[in-house]
């Protein structure tokens, strides 16, 4: 009985990881590419990889806090647009802008990494 439970616990993370990787289907549609692609592109263009733990410790106002020894490149969630008046077309479109999507993807990757660390 204990062996069965322990084997199921070992298989659970593998199943979760396969489900996550299979849900990222890059060939679905033009606007629905691989979710990690935006962050990878950001890193390839010279963006410094952000530390997830540093981001979650930041102030709620989202002011950029530099970590000593690191260059002052900003993470996807560091800068955001203030209150910009929306046009009539934008008001009815609920799709978030590219920046907030990049921020959401970054935070999602941080959460996935935090789940993978204890294993």
UniProtKB/Swiss-Prot annotation:
Keyword flag Oxidoreductase: no
Spans annotated as Disordered: 81-100
| One Pfam assignment | CXCL17
Q: Where is the signal peptide?
A: 1-21
Transmembrane stretches, start-end: none
Question: What is its subcellular localisation?
Answer: Secreted
**Keywords assigned:** Angiogenesis, Chemotaxis, Cleavage on pair of basic residues, Developmental protein, Differentiation, Disulfide bond, Secreted, Signal
Q: What is its main location?
A: secreted
Q: What does UniProt note about where in the body, tissue by tissue, this protein is expressed? A: Detected in trachea, stomach, lung and skeletal muscle. Detected in intestine and in normal and asthmatic lung (at protein level). Breast tumors showed 3- to 24-fold up-regulation.
Q: Please verify whether the record's keywords include Metal-binding.
A: no
Which domain of life does this protein belong to? Eukaryota
- Composition-biased stretches, type Basic residues, lie in 82-100
What triggers or suppresses the expression of this protein?
Found to be up-regulated in duodenal mucosa during acute cholera.
Show the disulfide pairing: 75-103, 77-110
Gene Ontology BP annotations: angiogenesis; cell differentiation; macrophage chemotaxis; negative regulation of inflammatory response; positive regulation of ERK1 and ERK2 cascade; positive regulation of macrophage chemotaxis; positive regulation of monocyte chemotaxis; positive regulation of vascular endothelial growth factor production
Q: InterPro entries, per this entry?
A: CXCL17
Summarizing the function annotation, the protein's role is: Chemokine that acts as a chemoattractant for monocytes, macrophages and dendritic cells. Plays a role in angiogenesis and possibly in the development of tumors. Acts as an anti-inflammatory in the stomach. May play a role in the innate defense against infections. Activates the C-X-C chemokine receptor GPR35 to induce a rapid and transient rise in the level of intracellular calcium ions.
Q: Which family does it belong to?
A: Belongs to the intercrine alpha (chemokine CxC) family.
Q: What is this protein called?
A: C-X-C motif chemokine 17
């Amino acid at each position: 009985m204990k062996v069965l439970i322990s084997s199921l616990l070992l298989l659970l993370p593998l199943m979760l990881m396969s489900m996550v990787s299979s849900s990222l289907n890059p060939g679905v549609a033009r606007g629905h590419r691989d979710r990690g692609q935006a962050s990878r592109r950001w890193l390839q263009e010279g963006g410094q990889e952000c530390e997830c733990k540093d981001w979650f410790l930041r102030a709620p106002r989202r002011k950029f806090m530099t970590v000593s020894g690191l260059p002052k490149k900003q993470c996807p969630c560091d800068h955001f647009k203030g209150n910009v008046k929306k046009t009539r077309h934008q008001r009815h479109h609920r799709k978030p802008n590219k920046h907030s999507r990049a921020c959401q993807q970054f935070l999602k990757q941080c959460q996935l990494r935090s789940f993978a660390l204890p294993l």
